[in-house]
């Protein structure tokens, strides 16, 4: 059935499933009681090992070749995955969930800018307009975070968006490469790095069960997200991260009652509207251009 879908439908379905699976991730992170680097270690190690074992079980003989064939693009992507992992957890450790996820909602705009720089995809005027609007909204949120001494977490969230946008661009640039092995290496590299800062390698049963769920929310989700750019553009994949921006704080509010501030809501709504409007316009324009050809 999947093979009968068009490339646009395949990419859209993969991106949607991937981001929907990851939406409870911030809630799980907020619910565990371990130290930040301990969380980062287990959040990377367990999904990384699970995906590694699963990949070799499912693909058997070709698995090792897939890892060997990731090339320079795969190595760069693995480093970007490492950066995104570290900055995401650091963002949630230093600011509210809503603030962190709002920063990450900038992924489509950042991906569009990177596509212009590295893929020679000339952006529309609307891209620059939306980028400027998002910049103003980010400054608005940053200013409040500075007053509340939470600006460091917002900064980590912005860095995470940059890493994810760059990763999507790398994957878009080399659609012939299977980036799932690259993602697995990125997770394992994060575990190795964070192991140097772990305070204790023993955690409670409750925390272990919650972190084990990240095999699905972090591991499986990004397998779908890693494959999606083979079928649709980076900005199109990035638009689905708005689901995480919208649903992530909702789960946290419903279960542990963490409410975003009024200024965060105002800035966040502005960013979501700008990013959604930009991505919708770009998708429609791409479809019109294809029909014209």
Model-based region annotation:
Residues 20-35, 39, 46, 86-95, ...:
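Juxtamembrane C-cap of transmembrane helices in multi-pass membrane transport proteins
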Residues 2-4, 44, 143, 242, ...:
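C-terminal-most transmembrane helix of multi-pass membrane proteins
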Residues 34-83, 110-111, 163-167, 183-200, ...:
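Transmembrane alpha-helices of multi-pass small-molecule transport proteins
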Residues 1-41, 87, 132, 146-173, ...:
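Glycine-/small-residue-enriched transmembrane alpha-helix faces in small-molecule transporters
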Residues 88, 107-129, 198, 246-266:
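C-terminal transmembrane-helix exit sites in multi-pass transporters
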Residues 10-18, 62-87, 152-160, 195, ...:
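Loop-to-transmembrane-helix transition segments
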Residues 51, 123-143, 162-164, 188-194, ...:
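Hydrophobic transmembrane alpha-helices of multi-pass small-molecule transport proteins
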Residues 100-106, 171-189, 218-254:
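Helix-helix packing/entry segments at the starts of transmembrane helices
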